[in-house]
Amino acid sequence: MSANRRDWQSAGIGQPDVVSELKSYLAKLPGAGRPGKGEPYLGIVHRLDQPVEGLLVFAKDKKAAAALSKQLAEGALNKHYYAVLCGYPDCPEGDLVDYLRKEGNVAVAVTGREQEFADAKIAALHYRILEEINDPSPLALADVTIGTGRFHQIRVQFAHAGFPLLGDTKYGMAALKEAMPAQKYRGVALCAYSLELVHPISGKKMGFRVVPKNPAFAGFAMEELKKLTENETGISKRG
């Protein structure tokens, strides 16, 4: 099992992706010789949207992959996200519940019309606002947990609520014209920053954390943010 961090910039043509790099690393480990068996096994337990950064979980064998996938399905694999929202939500903490359906390569909220679509699925998330700034337009830093794993869920639900994620050109173009006057940011301001799981072999509880690298997070007081996350305190306002 490996918990790995993805750089906020997606791999482009000719650039190695994280899966290829991990397989290359595993192939070079002592005793990794696999005569006649091809490349090392690497199971992807869960994925992130291409423009999103953060922690990923991989399994080095099928048994571990099955155990970790079971944790994910049962909600025992706990993930937290940081998201930068365009605007200030009225409630500093709350839940968003919507019905989503996939149309091609995008997800669409059909809340209130879900009975019209057989493929509409419920999507639920919980958020807590950690900090609010003006840079130069109103931006809010949210800590997000999801109760379901729908396609583009966090991005679509916040956009549907009127607070699209900074940098999300797919779901928040109108808000981005104000929030990104000179294309100051690139990539979606969303990071899977915290991950907790039970090791599939040892049974040990494990936790991992990363600090976002996307410059969209640079305007927030990250040291203060760490304290807020650890101590469960209130909202910090700056600017």
Map each language-model feature to its residues.
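RNA pseudouridine synthases
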Residues: 1-239
